[in-house]
Amino acid sequence: ADEFPDLGGASDIFQTLRAVLFEANLGEVYDRLGDRRDALLKDTVRWNVELARRLTAADVGRALRGRGALQERVRLFFERFDLIALPTVQVLPFPVELDWVHEIDGVPMSNYLEWMRSCTDISVTGCPAISVPFGFAPVDDGAADGADVPVGLQLVAAPGHELLLLQVAHALDGDGWLTRRAPVDTVAR
């Protein structure tokens, strides 16, 4: 089916709650490092801690309420469907020298999480998810020396349906994916 649950707000919810977790787990380390933090902490770690420190209790409350509403929309979706299938990430594998993808198809990413929204948005739902290899896509930008690169298919099930998810993933994994090639027009760049 061409239907998909409404994940509106998922990106902001994810970023807010992730930042709070970074502050809770690494805020003390961030403070102790003082002037050395730029040299010793990855910029994305600093970004999360600093984001958390700019948030208000109202911001966190909105994120928690938003997550509850989003999870309810997804629960209702799963009353009609068994699984969601979507690309694991929005881009093909990129050079290891890049920390993260800064632009997709001419659209700038505002932070290091946006290039993987198809994963982070699903994380907010609280649903079990798995990524399975699902063939290869040709790359014509010279970055991969003309070799095809692997693509993943993300499968998502309703909470409590982990067995179904694993059964479908196992069936797909044993289905000769190594010989499949994805059509270029179905893979976001």
Predicted features along the sequence, with ranges:
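Short, surface-exposed loop/helix-turn segments at secondary-structure junctions
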Residues: 14, 62, 94-116
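Acidic-enriched catalytic cores of C-N bond-cleaving enzymes acting on peptides and small amides
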Residues: 1-5
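Short, active-site-adjacent cap segments at secondary-structure transitions
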Residues: 7-8, 91-94
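Hydrophobic alpha-helical segments in the ANL/AMP-binding
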Residues: 113-125
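Tryptophan-centric aromatic hotspots in well-structured domains and transmembrane helices
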Residues: 47, 71, 100, 115-118
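Short helix-loop capping/hinge segments that flank enzyme active sites or metal/cofactor-binding pockets
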Residues: 16-75, 91, 131-150
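Structural helix-boundary/capping segments
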Residues: 50, 61-64, 72-75, 80, ...
